[in-house]
Amino acid sequence: MLYQGETLQLHWLDNGIAELVFNAPGSVNKLDTRTVASLGEALAVLEKQTELKGLLLRSTKAAFIVGADITEFLSLFAAPAEKLQEWLNFANAIFNRLEDLPVPTISAINGYALGGGCECILATDFRVASPDARIGLPETKLGIMPGFGGSVRLPRLLGNDSALEIIAAGKDVSAKDALKVGLVDAVVAPEKLVEAALKMLQQAIEGKLDWRAYRQPKLEPLKLSPIEAAMSFTTAKGMVMQTAGKHYPAPMTAVKTIEAAARLGRDEALKLETASFVPLARSKEARALVGIFLNDQFVKGQAKKLAKGIEAPKQAAVLGAGIMGGGIAYQSALKGVPVVMKDISDKSLTLGMNEAAKLLNKQLERGKLDGMKMAQVLSTIQPTLDYAGIERAQVIVEAVVENPKIKAAVLSEVEGLIGENTVLASNTSTIPINHLAKSLKRPQNFCGMHFFNPVHRMPLVEIIRGEQTSDSTIAAVVAYASRMGKTPIVVNDCPGFFVNRVLFPYFAGFSMLLRDGADFRQIDKVMEKQFGWPMGPAYLLDVVGIDTAHHAQAVMAAGFPERMGKDYRDAIDVMFDNQRFGQKNQLGFYRYSQDNKGKPRKDNDEQTDVLLAEVSQPRQTISDEEIIARMMIPMINEVVRCLEENIIASPAEADMALVYGIGFPPFHGGAFRYLDTLGTANYVELAQRYAHLGALYQVPAGLRAKAEHNESYYPVAAPLSDVSTGQPA
């Protein structure tokens, strides 16, 4: 043994070849600060070995290196700029030493080699991969860019266009595609991976492969003529502007950095990479996107804990077909849980089966599944007009019309036909679970399971715990949602649960702006282009359905009359009374027609202004800043109330529910991350300017208390102090 660290070892093989093995405690290797420092120590030992002829890098885990340890990022990024730069210089010097070893080097890559793992293998001369390998640089998805030489080495290895595509999009590629673009030199069976790597290394040692010729391009400027460079970078910038936009600066920064470094050798190019990385890492976008990654891990971990030891159901049932029921049945069947789909209407069953078939056809067209798999999935959806087969289901999801009497009747009826341990769940969006539970003899077996539309696309499922819901019921439904490929978040019961409870104050802010003379088109534009929502409120209401929103608004007003009740007609009432229900009947705030691909096309409709004049003051000029404040304050206040009332358990779960349920802009990180970025004291000061608008604008007591000391909702990361180890203070 030449070197033994906590996460890697270095020892001799035969014939002067050394092997550096990544073998961290736990299930995966990460290129954390400890491992980077350890790599430097191992190289220091290796550099003294006069008999060294070659070096092999490999992993003992199912993945080579999954990337950096993202749990360290917030501490690293909280460091002063000069400390972070010092740490990057320290790390890059280590990878340069790996690349500059006076012998050939090779990486044997199995599973994932992402982020820092990819940058590590780029520093070796050769790369051999098993067929299951996936290699890439996902940093831009976290609001940063490669920091260990990825933006320098990848373009010089692959050529500019292929490298820009991977880096700007944060992509990873399969072993097969990596071979095509020159990211790996060979793809071999897993059992022959090390053998093949050693064979290639031996060829390099014997001079049959010119390892210096493989290494040299990575040390030199990019081989591009001025015209080629202009074309390549102009195209890349255009694509980034189109896909990432102004709210996600990392992809454009990466492209511009690669462009600026194109005429430089490795060491000077690395200085530019570091100079670009530091401000990105310290940006609010990076904090938000890293926060989302960490919150996603936390939420998935919570789901695993809740469902520990519980098997997902082997058979499920959906009561109520149509678009929603068909979507739930499709998702269940697609993920391997057969489902009975029951409805009282043959027409609805046909609609539900057609919805499932349509979604499967799209998968077929995209090459995600073949005809046999499609037929198999469809065959596991059993449509029925009676309750045939319902007794086999371990979880039954009621998805009938959003009417408490009808839902209660359906739930009561099915309860009499099923076993004592069968779990019942209601896919309701607003009706309190405690209210529906009154119709049941076994309320402990009942909870809410709120899917979002369209079911196949929206990741969130709200699991609603009623007062009498048992832990085993929650565990079973969480296990089912996870099996369906969804992200379940458990909330406590109240009207609207969490997501709709906080969404309707946002719509109320919209209605009040219209009442005060704002233009709904300007509001949509500001909330989409400036704040970053995928849809502005008017457009979102049209997509949700004005009739659906009108009904839900009434439920919310009854549940929270002091804040959500109103004594005036608003824009939603006007649209509803004029049967302008949105996309479903082609008329809402906007007029809709079909484009040449059959998708809804949104156009302005002058009649909307005529109708809204009934409930609006004459048109007023309202600033973008005021629109954002008046739209967001009611939502944020309600989100905070939900945390204070224990409707939602943590800021992390609240923020992920908002991002996954209603598309809260990821670069803000969710409501609590947004609050922390603004500063609680600044937020309270802002909200007080609009306190005269009513109860929705009154800041909750807990938030006021935090604001007195400008406390944050998320823990403040301890900044990095020791650049030789990368450890926090």
From Swiss-Prot:
<dbReference type="InterPro" id="IPR029045">
    <property type="entry name" value="ClpP/crotonase-like_dom_sf"/>
</dbReference>
<dbReference type="GO" id="GO:0004165">
    <property type="term" value="F:delta(3)-delta(2)-enoyl-CoA isomerase activity"/>
</dbReference>
<dbReference type="InterPro" id="IPR006108">
    <property type="entry name" value="3HC_DH_C"/>
</dbReference>
<dbReference type="GO" id="GO:0006635">
    <property type="term" value="P:fatty acid beta-oxidation"/>
</dbReference>
<keyword id="KW-0442">Lipid degradation</keyword>
<dbReference type="GO" id="GO:0036125">
    <property type="term" value="C:fatty acid beta-oxidation multienzyme complex"/>
</dbReference>
<dbReference type="InterPro" id="IPR050136">
    <property type="entry name" value="FA_oxidation_alpha_subunit"/>
</dbReference>
<feature type="binding site">
    <location>
        <position position="500"/>
    </location>
    <ligand>
        <name>substrate</name>
    </ligand>
</feature>
<comment type="similarity">
    <text>In the N-terminal section; belongs to the enoyl-CoA hydratase/isomerase family.</text>
</comment>
<keyword id="KW-0520">NAD</keyword>
<dbReference type="InterPro" id="IPR036291">
    <property type="entry name" value="NAD(P)-bd_dom_sf"/>
</dbReference>
<feature type="binding site">
    <location>
        <position position="296"/>
    </location>
    <ligand>
        <name>substrate</name>
    </ligand>
</feature>
<dbReference type="InterPro" id="IPR001753">
    <property type="entry name" value="Enoyl-CoA_hydra/iso"/>
</dbReference>
<feature type="binding site">
    <location>
        <begin position="400"/>
        <end position="402"/>
    </location>
    <ligand>
        <name>NAD(+)</name>
    </ligand>
</feature>
<feature type="binding site">
    <location>
        <position position="324"/>
    </location>
    <ligand>
        <name>NAD(+)</name>
    </ligand>
</feature>
<comment type="function">
    <text>Involved in the aerobic and anaerobic degradation of long-chain fatty acids via beta-oxidation cycle. Catalyzes the formation of 3-oxoacyl-CoA from enoyl-CoA via L-3-hydroxyacyl-CoA. It can also use D-3-hydroxyacyl-CoA and cis-3-enoyl-CoA as substrate.</text>
</comment>
<feature type="active site" description="For 3-hydroxyacyl-CoA dehydrogenase activity">
    <location>
        <position position="450"/>
    </location>
</feature>
<dbReference type="InterPro" id="IPR006180">
    <property type="entry name" value="3-OHacyl-CoA_DH_CS"/>
</dbReference>
<dbReference type="InterPro" id="IPR012799">
    <property type="entry name" value="FadB"/>
</dbReference>
<dbReference type="InterPro" id="IPR018376">
    <property type="entry name" value="Enoyl-CoA_hyd/isom_CS"/>
</dbReference>
<dbReference type="GO" id="GO:0008692">
    <property type="term" value="F:3-hydroxybutyryl-CoA epimerase activity"/>
</dbReference>
<comment type="similarity">
    <text>In the C-terminal section; belongs to the 3-hydroxyacyl-CoA dehydrogenase family.</text>
</comment>
<protein>
    <recommendedName>
        <fullName>Fatty acid oxidation complex subunit alpha</fullName>
        <ecNumber>4.2.1.17</ecNumber>
        <ecNumber>5.1.2.3</ecNumber>
        <ecNumber>5.3.3.8</ecNumber>
        <ecNumber>1.1.1.35</ecNumber>
    </recommendedName>
</protein>
<dbReference type="Pfam" id="PF02737">
    <property type="entry name" value="3HCDH_N"/>
</dbReference>
<keyword id="KW-0511">Multifunctional enzyme</keyword>
<comment type="pathway">
    <text>Lipid metabolism; fatty acid beta-oxidation.</text>
</comment>
<dbReference type="Pfam" id="PF00378">
    <property type="entry name" value="ECH_1"/>
</dbReference>
<feature type="binding site">
    <location>
        <position position="407"/>
    </location>
    <ligand>
        <name>NAD(+)</name>
    </ligand>
</feature>
<dbReference type="GO" id="GO:0070403">
    <property type="term" value="F:NAD+ binding"/>
</dbReference>
<dbReference type="Pfam" id="PF00725">
    <property type="entry name" value="3HCDH"/>
</dbReference>
<keyword id="KW-0443">Lipid metabolism</keyword>
<feature type="region of interest" description="3-hydroxyacyl-CoA dehydrogenase">
    <location>
        <begin position="311"/>
        <end position="729"/>
    </location>
</feature>
<dbReference type="GO" id="GO:0004300">
    <property type="term" value="F:enoyl-CoA hydratase activity"/>
</dbReference>
<dbReference type="GO" id="GO:0016509">
    <property type="term" value="F:long-chain-3-hydroxyacyl-CoA dehydrogenase activity"/>
</dbReference>
<dbReference type="InterPro" id="IPR008927">
    <property type="entry name" value="6-PGluconate_DH-like_C_sf"/>
</dbReference>
<dbReference type="InterPro" id="IPR006176">
    <property type="entry name" value="3-OHacyl-CoA_DH_NAD-bd"/>
</dbReference>
<keyword id="KW-0560">Oxidoreductase</keyword>
<keyword id="KW-0456">Lyase</keyword>
<keyword id="KW-0413">Isomerase</keyword>
<comment type="subunit">
    <text>Heterotetramer of two alpha chains (FadB) and two beta chains (FadA).</text>
</comment>
<feature type="region of interest" description="Enoyl-CoA hydratase/isomerase">
    <location>
        <begin position="1"/>
        <end position="189"/>
    </location>
</feature>
<feature type="binding site">
    <location>
        <position position="453"/>
    </location>
    <ligand>
        <name>NAD(+)</name>
    </ligand>
</feature>
